[in-house]
Amino acid sequence: MKFIDELDLELVNQTLNFETSESKISGGCDIFTTKPVASDKKLYKTIDRHLESLLQENESYNAAIQQQIELENKRRDPKQAGSDCAEPAEDSPTRNANSFWEQKRRMSVSESPRADTSPLFKSQKLNDQQLKELVSHPLEVPGCKSPSNETSARGVLRRSTSAGSFENNAGSAEQQKRRTSSIGSAANGTKSPILRRSSFNRETINIGPFGPISETASRRTFAYLIGILNASYPDHDFASLKPTDFVKSSRKQLVSKFENSIIALGKQPQEWIWETINAHMDLADCVFYQYNPQESFLDDEPGHLWSLMWFMFNKKRKRVAYFYLSAFRVKNPPSTGGSVALDEYYDSNSKPELREKRRRLTIEHETNDFEGEYDLTYTSSGDGAVEDEDEDMNDAD
């Protein structure tokens, strides 16, 4: 990526660098082209490997979730299937029994069978016997029914002389068929009645605001921001950042947050700054991202208070603008207030060891060795101290 040096952008940077009574503000707007150079290609490969590792971690997590869901289904399916088999159909036995007795009543009052009818209708005892068997052994819930009962039910349907009864039994059979297919599929494990399996596709995994992270365009956009941070802060390496360290923003949010910060610092927003940036970036065609990690790398910088960092990406013009504003605590001691103010400043900003050492050098400190009166009669000639006149007078006496 290549840095674009423009005079009007330099004026923007100078305007956004100032000091207040409590902090020093460092801001600016740097624009880069997305045309890669040799160092960028190496960075792109490093980022690709990093993103692949993130995808593998995500797939491993999803696989663990899938396995947990399958275990839950296996633990709950037998109970569900047993409850389905043990659960009596509320109206099935009664309805089937009433239907069978209704068929028998209609058959008893119907005309006698003709000579050319099938042997099935000639044997009234056979019909009664089959009806009694079906009544004594009603149709069971699908998955628990026996073949003999199913055959008997089919025999009754064939012998039915009522169209209404036939439609009723056909609807019941269709409902039973649907239940059988659902329970059978649950037993085979093709579809879980308890929990749905969460499906994930590698091609649609979104990690951060850049879209599907497996796509080249999404990875390149992420790499552009990493490359700009590396160029702006050469003492740090940002290749290990995650896409989730960035959030997608909008032009309105960016302008509002920036101008509110400027007003809080005692300055008035200036419209020409946005006009200058727009002339180089076409903000209407830009996508906005904000660097918003849990822990900022600037927290290790001495005196760092807060920082705001945005990126404006214009795919058409192949440009990325880095727009930032940071606040640092003022390092210089106050120039007013005399020695008392300086002492308070040094006491509050120096290390405890240095403060203790400085205090020991004062006369009033309790640990100094110079106690009592001071002898100021020492001469520079090395002859020793000058005797007191009072002592000479006493000797003379």
From Swiss-Prot:
Its domain of life reads: Eukaryota
Bias-annotated ranges (Polar residues): 120-129, 159-174, 181-191
Subcellular location(s): the record lists: Nucleus
Q: Where is this region: Disordered?
A: 72-195, 374-397
What the entry lists under PANTHER family is as follows:
REPRESSOR OF RNA POLYMERASE III TRANSCRIPTION MAF1 (PTHR22504), REPRESSOR OF RNA POLYMERASE III TRANSCRIPTION MAF1 HOMOLOG (PTHR22504:SF0)
Quote the function comment for this protein.
Mediator of diverse signals that repress RNA polymerase III transcription. Inhibits the de novo assembly of TFIIIB onto DNA.
Annotated protein name in UniProt: Repressor of RNA polymerase III transcription MAF1
Origin species, per record, is Eremothecium gossypii (strain ATCC 10895 / CBS 109.51 / FGSC 9923 / NRRL Y-1056)
Gene responsible for this protein: MAF1
